[in-house]
From Swiss-Prot:
Gene3D superfamilies the UniProt entry points to: 1.20.5.170, Single helix bin, Vasodilator-stimulated phosphoprotein
Note: There are two types of hair/microfibrillar keratin, I (acidic) and II (neutral to basic).
Region annotated Head, chain positions: 1-93
Subunit details: Heterotetramer of two type I and two type II keratins.
InterPro entries for this protein: IF_conserved, IF_rod_dom, Keratin_I
Induction field: mRNA synthesis is suppressed during retinoic acid-mediated orthokeratotic conversion of tail scale epidermis.
Annotated protein name in UniProt: Keratin, type I cuticular Ha6
Tissue expression from the record: In skin, only expressed in the suprabasal cells of tail scale epidermis. Suprabasally expressed in stratified squamous epithelia and also in the posterior unit of the complex filiform papillae of tongue. Expressed in rare anatomical sites in which an orthokeratinized stratum corneum would be too soft and a hard keratinized structure would be too rigid to meet the functional requirement of the respective epithelia.
Marked site: Stutter: 342
Matches recorded under Pfam families: Filament
Domain of life: Eukaryota
Length: 473
């Protein structure tokens, strides 16, 4: 009696059998060879323990689903596992049923757990999308307008301050001009007073000279009178002496009139004094006029020089004030430019940091989305495989029983169970075995990956895009 040995090997997400099966599920068709019959076997994957319930349709009937033959043993399904079915049919149906029921319960529990995890992940993704409110750049237009108004006010205030400073400087210059004029007039007054004092001293000296001359004239007059008296006395004395002695008549020259001579001398002296006085007065007048002319010319020149100096000082002060105003305006403009550059550079740095942060957040979100999409794809793949496996088990449980002959070595076997078939799965016997029928393809299970992209702004959905990707199992 020849038997077919089929040893499927499990891996994460796929199953391969040594009989040539590959894909997510492995099916072995019913084989009738040398009077022995073996029912098809279906094995699940994805790290979960798969089990299903089988039943007997009666004595001599073929077991639907999967059964354990003699010498068949199972290994753990933590990530990988396999069935090694060798030998004949095992008669311990109750133990087999118990094991299969336990495996089915574990499988259903694992399915429910995965569904709960899928629901939790969907809730977390939804909450994360709700929490991730798109960053709205604040509107700085009002602040820019306020800043421009403040800058205009600052410029107007600076210009007003410059105008007030210019007026103050002009007032200071006018005060300096008046002070200079006052000092000039004061110096002129002092000079005139000094000249007057000098002229008064000269007048006093001339008065003293006049008094001296008058005193001299008086003394000369007194001396002349004394001389006249003495002369008369001498003449009288001589006459008296001559009268007593001799009367001598002498024919002499006429006598000299002394009064006339004195009058002539007096006239000469008076004319001389008058001439001297006129000369001195003329000289004094000429000297005074020359001095006054020199003083006037000097004062005029001094006044001209002082006015020129004042004008030059005023011009210099106005130019200095204008220079200071221009320098202050330049400094204010430079400070304003520096402040503007610093403000815009800081705003640019903040925006650059914000852009960098947003880009990093977008990169993180993209990585999270890719990771979650990958996990979601893996979960969808697992879910689809589990659903297909559940559907397969359900069809196996709800299908018709396969009637087997009473004798295990009968030459015919009519399987009553149709198992889904993966197109890439082939049945290759390990020994001489004649299959009961050709391998018919089972219906394919197709899945769709639906990606919904929503753009949310201020808590409102602006746009929504849906992308459906068909995926065949």
């Amino acid at each position: 009696m020849a038997t077919q040995i089929c040893t499927p090997t499990f891996s994460a997400g796929s199953a391969k059998g040594l009989c040539g099966t590959s894909g997510s599920f492995s099916r072995i068709s019913s084989i009738h060879s040398m009077g022995s019959c073996r029912a098809p076997s279906l094995v699940g994957t994805v790290g979960s323990v798969s089990s299903f319930r089988t039943g007997f349709s009666g004595p001599g009937s073929c077991l639907p689903g999967s059964y354990l033959s003699s010498g068949c043993h199972s290994s753990g399904f933590a990530g990988s596992g396999g069935w090694f079915c060798e030998g004949a049919f095992n008669g311990n149906e109750k133990a087999t049923m118990q094991i299969l029921n336990d495996r089915l319960a574990n499988y259903l529990e694992k399915v429910r757990q995965l569904e709960q995890e899928n629901t939790q992940l969907e809730c977390r993704i939804r909450e994360w999308y709700e929490c991730q409110i798109p960053y709205i750049c604040p509107d700085y237009q009002s602040y820019f307008k306020t800043a421009e108004e403040l800058q205009q006010k600052i410029l107007l205030t600076k210009s007003e301050n410059a105008r007030l400073i210019l007026q103050i400087d002009n007032a200071k210059l006018a005060a300096d001009d008046f002070r200079t004029k006052y000092e000039t007039e004061l110096s002129l007054r002092q000079l005139v007073e000094a000249d007057i004092n000098g002229l008064r001293r000269i007048l006093d000296e001339l008065t003293l000279c006049k008094a001296d001359l008058e005193a001299q004239v008086e003394s000369l007059k007194e001396e002349l009178l004394c001389l006249k008296r003495n002369h008369e006395e001498e003449v009288n004395a001589l006459r008296s002496q001559l009268g007593d002695r001799l009367n001598v008549e002498v024919d002499a020259a006429p006598p000299v009139d002394l009064n006339k001579i004195l009058d002539d001398m007096r006239c000469q002296y008076e004319t001389l004094v008058e001439n001297n006085r006129r000369d001195v007065e003329a000289w004094f007048n000429t000297q005074t006029e020359e001095l006054n002319q020199q003083v006037v010319s000097s004062s005029e020149q001094l006044q001209c020089c002082q006015t020129e100096i004042i004008e030059l000082r005023r011009t210099v002060n106005s130019l200095e004030i204008e220079l200071q105003a221009q320098q202050s305006m330049r400094n204010s403009l430079e400070s304003t430019l520096a402040e503007t550059e610093a403000r815009y550079s800081s705003q640019l740095g903040q925006m650059q940091c914000l852009i960098t942060n947003v880009e990093s957040q977008l990169a993180e979100i993209r990585c999270d989305l890719e990771r979650q999409n990958h996990e979601y794809q893996v979960l969808l793949d697992v879910k689809a495989r589990l659903e297909s496996e559940i559907a397969t088990y359900r069809r196996l449980l709800d299908g018709e029983d396969c009637k087997l002959p009473a004798h295990p070595c009968s030459t015919e076997c009519k399987p009553a169970v149709r198992v889904p078939y993966i197109p890439s799965t082939t049945c290759t016997p390990a020994g001489p075995c004649t299959p009961a029928g050709p391998c018919t393809p089972a219906p394919q299970v197709s899945t769709q990956i639906r990606t919904i992209t929503e753009e949310i702004r201020d808590g409102r959905v602006i746009s929504s895009r849906e992308h459906v990707v068909p995926r065949a199992m």
